[in-house]
UniProtKB/Swiss-Prot annotation:
This is GTPase IMAP family member GIMD1. Gene3D superfamilies: P-loop containing nucleotide triphosphate hydrolases. The keyword Nucleotide-binding applies. The gene is GIMD1. It comes from Bos taurus. Belongs to the TRAFAC class TrmE-Era-EngA-EngB-Septin-like GTPase superfamily. AIG1/Toc34/Toc159-like paraseptin GTPase family. IAN subfamily.
Length: 216
């Protein structure tokens, strides 16, 4: 293994039309994942995308590191066409296939900022994360809020938004040590969005001492 190169492995989870595939494309700087508005679930299968190599993006042990990001996109959960059992099995197999040995650095729960996270809704994607990642899931999970520009349009800033959040969301944030990222589209180029998201992801991975979750 080349100590001057590093691969960060991510998996995206979330409800249908939460913006998972679009967020994955922004992180990768590509159009690997099909993303579109639809009245039903768009993603039916798990898919792995890889970014180009980022040179001198970060330092580790005093040396510059070339970074590559791998992102696993997963079907929405619950899905409009597939059973919960089918989706869980599909994702379980994909995690084992792609990250079985290399390990997963971070699971991103993709949540629309303009859709309140309530108890019944929270039970689905979060429940799947808990089941598939195991009892240490909270150490490897962060929330990615998409459509964050809606917060500003409503007259809130990020802190005010979180203070007014549902009890369900606040409990979830507490359990994952307040790891969250806001994704803005309005007024930001794709490269700016990507850079800000990647910087936060690297921050979380560093705080976790670069540990990974492996799958058998």
């Amino acid at each position: 293994m080349n100590s001057n190169k590093m691969t960060i492995n991510l998996a995206l989870f979330g409800m249908t039309q939460s913006g998972k595939s679009s967020a994955g494309n922004i992180i990768l700087g590509s159009t690997d994942f099909h993303s579109s508005f639809a009245p039903c679930s768009v993603t039916r299968d798990c898919s792995l995308g890889r970014s180009c190599h980022f040179r001198s993006f970060m330092r580790r042990g005093g040396q510059e590191v070339t970074l590559q990001v791998q992102v696993l996109d997963t079907p929405g959960y619950p899905h409009s066409r597939l059973s919960k059992k089918h989706v869980r099995q599909e994702v379980r197999e994909a995690l084992a296939h792609h990250f079985g040995q290399e390990g997963l650095h971070l699971a991103l729960l993709v949540q629309r900022a303009d859709v309140p996270l309530c108890g019944q809704e929270e039970s689905s994607p979060v429940q799947m994360i808990q089941e598939l990642l195991g009892h240490t899931w909270m150490n490897y999970t962060a929330i990615l809020f998409t459509h964050a520009e809606k917060i500003e349009e409503a007259g809130f800033n990020e802190d005010e938004y979180l203070r007014e959040a549902s009890e369900t969301l606040l409990k979830l944030l507490n359990s994952i040590q307040h790891r969250y990222i806001f994704q803005y589209k309005k007024g930001n180029s794709l490269s700016e969005q990507r850079l800000k998201i990647l910087e936060r992801i690297i921050e979380f991975v560093k705080e976790n001492c670069y540990q990974v979750l492996t799958f058998k």
